């Protein structure tokens, strides 16, 4: 790890966090339900893009760009974009407001759909 790697991860993380914030606000303006749709869609779309790009970066792009794309995009941007901690907070809020079964369902659905999205993205990249 070099100083330039730290810079790329930090820059990418800032971009990803801003994207997450903006998309979350945009979804919140349209969707008024109790389900944490913004966090769910952000995490699922991020899982899809990570699955897709991880295949491209490992197969085609590493020779051209080295580890820059992996560092800046996968770890930085998509690491800042997706949000495990917000998913956990949303589940905790659901558990106190509506019951543990709904919170558990949200977590299970998030993980299963996220895995499917990442696998689908990887499959498309092949």
Curated annotation (Swiss-Prot):
Pfam families: CRCB (PF02537). Keywords: Cell inner membrane, Cell membrane, Ion channel, Ion transport, Membrane, Metal-binding, Sodium, Transmembrane, Transmembrane helix, Transport. The keyword Glycosyltransferase does not apply. Belongs to the fluoride channel Fluc/FEX (TC 1.A.43) family. The chain crosses the membrane at residues 7-27, 37-57, 68-87, 101-121. Na(+) binds at residues 79, 82. GO terms for cellular component: plasma membrane. Na(+) is not transported, but it plays an essential structural role and its presence is essential for fluoride channel function. It is a multi-pass membrane protein. The keyword Cell inner membrane applies. Fluoride-specific ion channel. Important for reducing fluoride concentration in the cell, thus reducing its toxicity. InterPro entries: FluC (IPR003691). It catalyses: fluoride(in) = fluoride(out). This is Fluoride-specific ion channel FluC 3.
